[in-house]
From Swiss-Prot:
InterPro entries tied to this protein: Anenome_toxin, Myo_ane_neurotoxin_sf
Keywords: Amidation, Disulfide bond, Ion channel impairing toxin, Nematocyst, Neurotoxin, Secreted, Toxin, Voltage-gated sodium channel impairing toxin
Cell inner membrane in keyword set: no
Other noteworthy facts: A synonymy between H.magnifica and R.crispa is controversial.
Family as reported in the entry's similarity comment: Belongs to the sea anemone sodium channel inhibitory toxin family. Type II subfamily.
Listed GO CC annotations: extracellular region; nematocyst
Signal peptide: none
Organism this protein belongs to: Radianthus crispa (Leathery sea anemone)
Post-translational modification: Delta-SHTX-Hcr1f (RTX-VI) may be the result of post-translational modification of delta-SHTX-Hcr1a (RTX-III), which would consist of Arg-13 cleavage.
GO MF: sodium channel regulator activity; toxin activity
GO biological process: regulation of signal transduction
Subcellular localization: Secreted; Nematocyst
Protein name: Delta-stichotoxin-Hcr1a
């Protein structure tokens, strides 16, 4: 969606406090989001 996985913390690739790099799917309770600093990347974030 339009959510940003790492807009509330450090960059997900270097300090995954708000998300993790997506490997094709998101774990249960997580949502797929765009990376705030890397528009072409996707990652997963815990649903709020």
């Amino acid at each position: 969606g339009n959510c940003k996985c790492d807009d509330e913390g450090p960059y997900v690739r270097t300090a995954p406090l708000t998300g993790y790099v997506d490997l094709g799917y998101c774990n249960e309770g997580w949502e797929k989001c765009a990376s705030y600093y890397s528009p072409i990347a996707e990652c997963c974030r815990k649903k709020k």
